[in-house]
Amino acid sequence: DCGIQTLLFMTLARLNGIPVHWQSGFDLKPGEDNLHDWCEMYLEPYGWVLVDQSYGIKNSRDERVKWFCLGNTDPYRWIVNDDFSQPLYPAKIYPRSETVDFQRGEVEWRGGNLYFDAWEYDYHIEYMSE
């Protein structure tokens, strides 16, 4: 799970004095769109750089490809969250379905929370070409 991997990476980085923060959203590669979690870490002199440990080090002889997921981003990433487990506004009355992320939203009614299997969401992606 990319969220657990990200939280583990962030914990290990912080234990070693490396500033990190959470990001999550959607990975919108054609044919592979899905929810996704990753983080950024602060590296002098570059500032905040993306780290996507879920994809790891690529098996490539090309060093640019091999290390791409450390400090680079692809054009298919849609950032929705810059932190995790934050309060919602307006506040929910019932417990949240997702306590860490907030990519797909939350739904509740006067009878309680509606977990993800009780409702659907959809999105349409239009890829632009030059």
PLM regions with names:
Residues I4-Y94:
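Hydrophobic/aromatic-rich core segments of domains that either
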